[in-house]
Amino acid sequence: MTDRLRPIPPEDWTDAQRAAAQDIINGPRGALYGPFVPLLRSPELMGYAQKLGEYLRYRSAIGVRLSELAILVTAREWDQQVEWAIHAPIAQQVGVPPDVIDAIARRERPAALLVDEAVVYD
């Protein structure tokens, strides 16, 4: 698959792009990938998107376990294989049971959901 917007080579980054990229690399993501590659064309917007995404994924009130469960349910619903491949192992690491992950992968409602997981799933 070809990128519609080719990545900007690091040697061509402006000072603002370099600073925005470094903020993401130094943050919890640890690397510049996914939507941040084309967003680098607008470093100010990229900064706002990064802050929103960081909050939703890492610091929201529902916690990391339920956040990862929501990501898996959404990834499966919309056939987002890359998101699934990235987040299924993370979900297991943060406490989503393997049988829950497997059921979602099969597009089935997991049989043994905790109350808070059922709220997210349903």
Identify the role of each PLM range.
Residues 3, 30, 47-52, 68-69, ...:
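A generic alpha-helix surface/boundary motif
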Residues 22, 30, 56, 73, ...:
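General N-terminal targeting signals
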Residues 52, 72-73, 87, 104-107:
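Short acidic/histidine-centered micro-motifs embedded in hydrophobic/aromatic stretches
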Residues 37, 71-72:
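Generic alpha-helical structural context detector
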Residues 99-122:
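Alpha-helical ds-nucleic-acid-binding substructure associated with the helix-hairpin-helix region
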Residues 45, 62, 66-68, 74-100:
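Conserved alpha-helical segments that form or flank metal/cofactor-binding pockets of metalloenzymes
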Residues 1-62, 97-98, 109-110:
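Acidic, glycine/proline-rich low-complexity segments that act as flexible tails and inter-domain linkers
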